[in-house]
C-alpha cells in the first residue's frame, strides 16, 4: 500500500467514477466490440493522436483488415497506405510485425498473459494494460497522459511525469484503487475523465464526479498539475523538395530507407540545404547521385512540418526531367494518376497539394 492510497476510500471512488462513466461515456466505434485485435488497433492509433482524428481511420483500417490474420498477411506497402495521414509510422510497423508473430506463435489469438503480450514488438506497459483489461478483464493498469494528469491532481503528486519512476508510481496507485471486478471499465473511465473533465487547461472541477476525493481541488492547485519539465529545443532542418515531371507526365518519387524516420514511405526528392541555395543543391544532388538532368523553377511555397524531435522547414521547387539514364531504385517514375496508390508522409502529401494548386493556376509563387 502506498502512502497516497493508505486512507483513500477506493470503493466509494470506484462507485462514483463508474456511475459517471456509465452515463457519460462517448459512443466510439472501438467500444462496440471487445475483440482483442480491434481493441489493440484502436489503442495503437490513439497513441499521440486525437480521438476525433482516429475515428475514420479506425473504421477504414478495420474495413480493410477486419481480422488479425488479414493484417498479418497484408503487404507492408498496403498497410502503410492504410495508415497514411496518421503519422508516427513506427506504430503501424510495430503492430504489423507483432500481429505476424501472434499469428505464427499464438495461432492468431492475442495472448492474455501480460508477460507474453509485452514481449511483442511495440507493446509497452500502457498497451498491455489497455488491451488486456478491456478485451480480457485482466487487472492491469493502463496509465497514459490522461491518467497521469488525473492521478497527479487526485493525490497531489508533484513528481515530474516525464520520468519513468513517476509512471511506475502511478501504475502502483492504479493497482491499489482499481475496481478488480471490472478493470477494463475502470481504466477506460479514468482515461475518459482526463479527456472530458480533468483536462490540461481549465479543468471542469465543478462538474467532476470525483471532486470530493481530489486533493488538488481542495488546495486550489488543479491547474498547476501535473508537473512536466520542458523539453529542450527541437532541431530545425531546412529541406529543399523537388516535384519533377518528365515529358510523359510521370513524376519522380523515391522510397525512403527501410529504417529510421518515415521508413519505407514514398516522397519527392529532397535534400538538406543548411542555408545554402536549395535549387542549386537539388539540381546537384539529382544530377550527381542519379545521373538525371533537371530544370527547376523558383520555389512556390515554404512551410514547416513538426515531429516530436525535429522540425522540417520545406521549400518546394517544381521542375522537369530533361534527360538522363534509366531511373533506378530507390527512385521511380510514377504516372500522376497512380500517385494516390503510394503511401506518402503528411508533409509530402502537402507538397503535392501545393504543387497541384500552383500547376492549375490557383496560386503563384510569391
Swiss-Prot record:
It is an enzyme of class 3 (hydrolase). GO terms for biological process: base-excision repair; mismatch repair. One of its GO terms (molecular function) is purine-specific mismatch base pair DNA N-glycosylase activity. Pfam families: EndIII_4Fe-2S, HHH, HhH-GPD, NUDIX_4. The keyword Transcription regulation does not apply. Keywords: 4Fe-4S, DNA damage, DNA repair, DNA-binding, Glycosidase, Hydrolase, Iron, Iron-sulfur, Metal-binding. It catalyses: Hydrolyzes free adenine bases from 7,8-dihydro-8-oxoguanine:adenine mismatched double-stranded DNA, leaving an apurinic site. DNA binds at residues 30-31, 48-49, 86-88, 126, 188, 308. Its cofactor is [4Fe-4S] cluster. Residues 105-133 form the HhH domain. [4Fe-4S] cluster binds at residues 198, 205, 208, 214. Binds 1 [4Fe-4S] cluster. The cluster has a structural role. Belongs to the Nth/MutY family. This is Adenine DNA glycosylase.
Amino acid at each position: 500500500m502506498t502512502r497516497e492510497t493508505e486512507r483513500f476510500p477506493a470503493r466509494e471512488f470506484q462507485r462514483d467514477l463508474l456511475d459517471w462513466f456509465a452515463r457519460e461515456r462517448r459512443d466510439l466505434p472501438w467500444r462496440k466490440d471487445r475483440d482483442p485485435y480491434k481493441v489493440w488497433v484502436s489503442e495503437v492509433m490513439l497513441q499521440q493522436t486525437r480521438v476525433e482524428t482516429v475515428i475514420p481511420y479506425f473504421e477504414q483500417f478495420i474495413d480493410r483488415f477486419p481480422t488479425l490474420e488479414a493484417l498479418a498477411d497484408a503487404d507492408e506497402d498496403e498497410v502503410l497506405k492504410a495508415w497514411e495521414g496518421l503519422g508516427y509510422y513506427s506504430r503501424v510497423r510495430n503492430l504489423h510485425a507483432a500481429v505476424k508473430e501472434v499469428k505464427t506463435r499464438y495461432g492468431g489469438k492475442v495472448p492474455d498473459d501480460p508477460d507474453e503480450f509485452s514481449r511483442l514488438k511495440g507493446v509497452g506497459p500502457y498497451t498491455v494494460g489497455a488491451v488486456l483489461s478491456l478485451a480480457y478483464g485482466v487487472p492491469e493498469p493502463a496509465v497514459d497522459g490522461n491518467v497521469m494528469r488525473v492521478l497527479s491532481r487526485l493525490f497531489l503528486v508533484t513528481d515530474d511525469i516525464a520520468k519513468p519512476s513517476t509512471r511506475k508510481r502511478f501504475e502502483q496507485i492504479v493497482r491499489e484503487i482499481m475496481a478488480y471486478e471490472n478493470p477494463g471499465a475502470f481504466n477506460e473511465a479514468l482515461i475518459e475523465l482526463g479527456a472530458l473533465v480533468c483536462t490540461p487547461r481549465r479543468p471542469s472541477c465543478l462538474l467532476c464526479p470525483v471532486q470530493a476525493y481530489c486533493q488538488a481541488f481542495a488546495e486550489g492547485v488543479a491547474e498547476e498539475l501535473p508537473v512536466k519539465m520542458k523539453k529542450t529545443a527541437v532541431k530545425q532542418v531546412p529541406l529543399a523538395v523537388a516535384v519533377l515531371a518528365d515529358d510523359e507526365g510521370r513524376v519522380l518519387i523515391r522510397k525512403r530507407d527501410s529504417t529510421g524516420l518515415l521508413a519505407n514511405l514514398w516522397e519527392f526528392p529532397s535534400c538538406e540545404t543548411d542555408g545554402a541555395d536549395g535549387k542549386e543543391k537539388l539540381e546537384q544532388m539529382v544530377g550527381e547521385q542519379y545521373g538525371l538532368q533537371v530544370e527547376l523553377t523558383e520555389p512556390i511555397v515554404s512551410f514547416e512540418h513538426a515531429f516530436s524531435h525535429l522540425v522540417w522547414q520545406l521549400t518546394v521547387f517544381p521542375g522537369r526531367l530533361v534527360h538522363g539514364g534509366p531511373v533506378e531504385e530507390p527512385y521511380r517514375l510514377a504516372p500522376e494518376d497512380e500517385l494516390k496508390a503510394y503511401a506518402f508522409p503528411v508533409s509530402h502529401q502537402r507538397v503535392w497539394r501545393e504543387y497541384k494548386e500552383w500547376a492549375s493556376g490557383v496560386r503563384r509563387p510569391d
